[in-house]
Amino acid sequence: MKKTLAALIVGAFAASAANAAVVYNNEGTNVELGGRLSIIAEQSNSTVDNQKQQHGALRNQGSRFHIKATHNFGDGFYAQGYLETRFVTKASENGSDNFGDITSKYAYVTLGNKAFGEVKLGRAKTIADGITSAEDKEYGVLNNSDYIPTSGNTVGYTFKGIDGLVLGANYLLAQKREGAKNTNKQPNDKAGEVRIGEINNGIQVGAKYDANDIVAKIAYGRTNYKYNEADEHTQQLNGVLATLGYRFSDLGLLVSLDSGYAKTKNYKTKHEKRYFVSPGFQYELMEDTNVYGNFKYERTSVDQGEKTREQAVLFGVDHKLHKQLLTYIEGAYARTKTTNGGVKTEKEKSVGVGLRVYF
């Protein structure tokens, strides 16, 4: 019998967790190890970076390792600790092709109850993560973090007591602060202060509904960023992300419309507004083979100043060779026109073939 798209999406989303190895299970305590190794071979060209010709690369694409420990207290109460690492070095640095330094991507603890919800503390995803429906493996054309941060140093609450419905709220705290020494390795009199341009604090609320072939999600966030060293004023970002979709289960097809709006309030400079709309689809071509794509139109404007319009399209095909082995081909093209006295047009295009091995 043909799998429903809902089952495929859930399976893909939880692939690494489903393949994790249980290394300890005793007296209500469960410890799992898992992750994936991901490689992509690509060709890319960008007038934004003044490239004269296409560049090819074979590099890391989101390889990760995680450890999760869960302890069940009884009566539905539990505690969980989670740590996930990533490779973070850029391909242009140290010739690493993104296989350089290893850092902690997520690290948090959770206290919860199946009926009352859970509280999460640490570096984690927020309720804004996963709001949009567009599928991508590498070249996603949606910049959700420009509207609402999707992760950070947070205290969050999530409620999943109603089938298909998730409610959540997050408070974001500062994460990136000045070190004891500056870039010249001299004592830094700003040590401990939030870095300019980084998150100072923020709040988010959101709701996600995914049941009965209907997908509806929305999140709102207000985030304050450090403005400068001269005063205590902040740069405030107010943003909304939303998606609305419908699954034609018999056809294995999901159609969706993602959208977002944000306004950045600057203390002494002009305010900035941005919005985007993005129709997309995901289609089960055959068992274990899926086709997906989306188009985006985004507009950014500064009060009585620069205006930017971007049109982008993404298309991809993935095939599961084994429950722990996924291959895909994906391409994206973006065209950006900036108007500020004159007109400047920039183009970016990328295509890649990737392989993921889960463990």
Curated annotation (Swiss-Prot):
GO MF terms, alphabetically ordered: porin activity
Main location: membrane
Signal sequence interval, chain numbering: 1-20
Membrane topology: Multi-pass membrane protein
GO terms of biological process kind: monoatomic ion transport
Gene3D superfamilies: Porin (2.40.160.10)
Recorded family membership: Belongs to the Gram-negative porin family.
Summary of the function given for this chain in its UniProt record: Forms pores that allow passive diffusion of small molecules across the outer membrane.
UniProt-recorded name of the protein: Outer membrane protein P2
Organism: Haemophilus influenzae (strain ATCC 51907 / DSM 11121 / KW20 / Rd)
Name of encoding gene: ompP2
